[in-house]
Amino acid sequence: MASVPSLASTLQQQLADALTAALPDAGAADPLLRRSDRADFQANGILALAKKLKGNPRELAAQVTAALPAGGLIKDIEVSGPGFLNVTLTDRAIVETLAARAADGEGRLGVPLKDDAGTTVIDYAQPNVAKEMHVGHLRSAVIGDAVVRILEFTGENVVRRHHIGDWGTQFGMLIQYLIEHPGALQHEGGPGDGASDGEAAMSTLNRVYKESRALFDSDEEFKARSRDRVVALQAGDPGTLELWHRFVDESKIYFHSVFDKLDMEIRDPDIVGESGYNDMLEETCRILEETGVAVRSEGALCVFFDDVKGPDGNRVPLIVKKTNGGYGYAATDLSAVRNRVQDLKADTLLYVVDARQSLHFRMVFETARRAGWLGDDVKAVQLAFGTVLGKDGKPFKTREGETVRLEDLLDEAVQRATAVVRDKAEKVGLSEEEIVENGRYVGIGAVKYADLSTSAVRDYKFDLDQMVALHGDTSVYLQYAYARIRSILRKAGDAVPAAHPELELAPAERALGLHLDQFGEVLAEVGTGYEPHKLAAYLYQLASHLTTFYDQCQVLSPDNAPEVVENRLFLVELTARTLHRGMALLGIRTPERL
């Protein structure tokens, strides 16, 4: 199915052609088209053009208007103010364009693939081995997953990377404990479902961590053996590596159980942790030192920046290799840049990482550019995100002041949502199985939407009462909008959705139709700027237009002519398909009945 040009892009082209025809001296002028309250669109470009040509803007506007093709797209065009063009489109053009979108059998609603698709390596969802995931891990996972879905929909080749924390001195302590307590990682009972297996894995890892830490802090001989074990691990001792792999594998069971709850796909080949770059660290440091990008300072290998200074005014370096010979995080991150550009052929590197790490990544990117690993043809972007706050506006903690476990947060969201679904279940006729399933979809959707409807860089308050509210800017409001349309379509009987371009549209129908047509342009903007909150805003506005449409336009009224019923069914069905597709791109499910 060929892509469908939006009404705005078609009008933009017609106006640009008219500008060229009427004012050949203007060159390639931009009409500066935008949506307007005065008409469907307003073009403001003539004002600047008149200054350039030293002409009367209203007279120039009249010349451009005369050069526009008659009929078809434009119903009315009015010159207002100092040469603004207020353009109203024909109802036929709106319905015919929407009909072309509805006819797209590939489920893309006529949205084109982008012309300049490349390869993006996106680094997101980065938990730590042998440690529980907490609320701080939520945003990278949710934002990253949505960006992956959106980029892939636009045609980008996306390579996912989960840079898990799977290396470090703490593994000496854990592995040494396992050597001295061989059964420490065994679970009680047999295998269960993914969630219970994950819970058992984390429970075991927690116990081993606490017991090994207690021994490490109290027993000097065990501490010495643990430090020797770190040396053996870093030297690649096979027996030590085998036990290290057990901790990684046990942690992956837990990771997958949490991501399954989040309704996210995490694939093992995409999990490339810190250890995945160990073989590159020495070469990375050697190249940096040989090229003069990094220099020795007090025994450490450092990269300095004139604009990065501490409170004392001295330059603060990026430490690539420590005085004791150990490698800093920067060495791993720089090795990852080399791998992703040279081996994975990325032309965009995208890091979905906490805003508090912005300075680190700015220094890493600049170092990589100095070393020639990031050329002018490769873009490196940190998609920085803010903090999850509690209702009190402070970082989200338990009542005891502890960090909130991510699983507990998700479980509570599902419980709250299930109660909301159950309240409506009898009226809709939901089975217990549907109540449980919808509760999961609504709860997880509420958590994701609260995050994604906020600009990533901003902090946001985690308020479950607000998240599962049936009204306002929430995912459940959008899910109910979708389910209501599906209910109308089931009740339509013999009437079928069908476009009728010959009909005159009511104001609410026009507003809904014009908004539906913007879907592709919104996705293009969201994909370019990595801003899923703009897609969330578009979907909320779509649901709001739908509510106005219901208030002003009866769909299945017996007073309506058959063609009016069919046309309105067509509009709501296309709205449902757009909601379904848009929510799926945010990683949120849309139940058929709710």
From Swiss-Prot:
InterPro entries: aa-tRNA-synth_I_CS, Arg-tRNA-ligase, Arg-tRNA-synth_N, Arg-tRNA-synth_N_sf, ArgRS_core, DALR_anticod-bd, Rossmann-like_a/b/a_fold, tRNAsynth_Ia_anticodon-bd. It catalyses: tRNA(Arg) + L-arginine + ATP = L-arginyl-tRNA(Arg) + AMP + diphosphate. Transmembrane segments: none annotated. A motif ('HIGH' region) lies at residues 127-137. Its EC number is 6.1.1.19. Pfam families: Arg_tRNA_synt_N, DALR_1, tRNA-synt_1d. One of its GO terms (biological process) is arginyl-tRNA aminoacylation. It is an enzyme of class 6 (ligase). Monomer. Belongs to the class-I aminoacyl-tRNA synthetase family. This is Arginine--tRNA ligase. The lineage of its organism: Bacteria, Bacillati, Actinomycetota, Actinomycetes, Kitasatosporales. The gene is argS.
